[in-house]
Amino acid sequence: MRTTTTSTTHLLIFLTWLASIASASAQSTKAKFDPNEPLEKYNMPPAYIYRLETSPRMISPFGAFISFQVNVDAQGNNILGDAANEPSIAVNPTDGSKITIGWRQFNSVQSDFRQGGWAFSTDGGVHWTFPGVLENNVFRSDPVLGAGDTGNFFYLSLRETFFDDIWRSTDGGQDWTRLTFGDVTGGDKQWLTIDNTQGMGHGFLYQAWSTGGNNFGGRQFSRSTDDGATWMSPIFIPNSPVWGTLDVASNGNLFIGGAENFSSPFRCVRSSNAQNPAVTPTFDQNTQVDLGGNLLFGGGINPGGLSGQCFLAVDRSGGPTNNNIYMLASVEPFSGGGTNVMFARSTDGGLTFSVPQRINDDPVNPNKWHWFGTLAVAPNGRIDSVWFDTRNAANNTDSQLFYSFSTDGGVTWSPNVPVSGAFTPFEGYPVQNKIGDYITIVSDNTGGDVAFPATYNFNPGTGQHEQDVYFVRVVPGGGPTPTPTATATGTPTSTPTATPRPTPTPRFAPTPRPRPTPGPRP
């Protein structure tokens, strides 16, 4: 019975993989938003794990960049048969060597039951400790992490009920304490930001979520004024933007970016009084933003998920670009065909935005995908953007992580640079046909820390590559010790030299090359 079940599962996985390849290559069946989009809900029980097997941890160098596997066991090994995706990263702003990453942890690819996984590093991302999940056998999804200015980490997690809860770590991500109990906030695709300015909203936590998987009649926003312990009753956001993020300007104004109609147009919504604990926040500015296309759900590159969310970030450098607002997303052009990383900026507090600007600098090709685009702003005002890119793939689907930066407020961007080897996004699916919905980056004055999923490890038991979470540090110019190119407003946080600890012999990824479509397993 075990052999028959396993063979059937492998056949289904292979057929799904073939369908994904055909969809991505043909470019003829890409779907816009479906109101019946699968939400992050409990579908299957945890899979029984007969025996936990391991292989050496993956370390994948590419030029001057090295990607380190994050989801490893207590001995530093890769865990065969599991899956990890949708990573969110937080970095201690007072000590850049202390990093934590949360992700959707699937203990077995035989079940889409997922939990709140996390790992921490104390040496700048070279070595990682994966203690386990927030709560054993508790369904969780959509992990979103953030850091307060004193170094506390926060972990926002969606539960199967479509309510969320928030956890805090005061020791660099080694231990977590749940702060909220009961059903007070949350919905599908929730996001978090923390007010790290020195105004009256200092330390406030803000979160917004989708109108889908929503228990509050479409209300999407809440605030905590006591470090996450309690939250106000949710309120409406004008035009109901979804699948986006939030950030706070240096004057304490809160900005929310997202997509209207689960597609486009995009919105930038401001609250200037959310920082005032004595009032219920109101939204006093609402701007339509053109990013040159639509957010895409069910595209051929990530069939069961998004091709990326909308990311909003605010410049708090104190320099010439201070309080600029930036929005970026991987969008499908209105004419159709693939996705591009598109960017717009506001220099007047979100009142108006620039025309959309294409960040990926390869020739326009509707068969190529530039997906999971994200961005962050460094304390010195440099903007970093990373995304998955298929420009070098003969099959138009094998993906690499690419990087570009801007030191003039997004007016010009550096030539795009690949920073990882290529991987196939169609293998290692944990029943659901996606590799998450987003990747994340945190920037400091000398570079950016990135968390992303990839399928570098190969599992001989399934005959497929596996979804795992990786960390890579990107730097302007690609050198190991970059110098900031804009005026810094604080002491730069450099990446410390790692102190090695005993680990198994790492396995290195080969130089990426186009791979043929694999044949079926018998």
Model-predicted segments: where are they?
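C-terminal PAP-associated
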Residues: 27-481
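Bacterial N-terminal signal peptides that target proteins for export
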Residues: 2-12
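Bacterial N-terminal signal peptides
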Residues: 10-21
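Sequence-pattern detector for short linear motifs
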Residues: 5, 20, 273, 348, ...
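Ser/Thr-rich, Proline-interspersed low-complexity disordered segments
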Residues: 479-521
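Accessible peptide chain termini
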Residues: 1-2, 520-522
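Sec/Tat signal peptide C-region and signal peptidase I cleavage site
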Residues: 22-26
